[in-house]
Swiss-Prot record:
Biased composition (Basic residues): 1-11
Region (Disordered): 1-20
Chief site of localization: nucleus
A single cellular component GO annotation: nucleus
UniProt keyword Nucleus present: yes
Organism of provenance: Schizosaccharomyces pombe (strain 972 / ATCC 24843) (Fission yeast)
BP GO terms, sorted: ribosomal large subunit biogenesis
Family as reported in the entry's similarity comment: Belongs to the ALB1 family.
Superkingdom, taxonomy of origin: Eukaryota
Location in or out of the cell: Nucleus, Nucleolus
Stated name of the protein: Uncharacterized protein C2D10.19c
The keyword Transmembrane helix belongs to this UniProt entry's keyword annotation: no
Keywords in alphabetical order: Nucleus
Amino acid sequence: MPHRNDRRKSASKAPNAIIHGRVASKKTIKKQLRNGKYSLKRLAEKGIHLDDIAMEIDNASKKNISKDKSLNENLFGKTEAGKQKDFMNIEPTCKGTILGAPPAL
């Protein structure tokens, strides 16, 4: 029984296909596009049209950017703007502020 990605079998089915190695699935191509290995323009030049996938890739990359920001804040602490914002938010209490200053009258 031939292997799943046998060279002879794939060459006889599609002579213009990539003969060496495995042929990437749509899911793999999506991942590689997201990671920057391919560009939609270069794939279109080769004859691969993934216009319907482009929207999904854009949405997924935006989600990854927001995840990366929160991950960076967790790993490396807050950014300078975040630290400044937290520093400026001092809520008064009955016995003064959190910093110990007398309450404003």
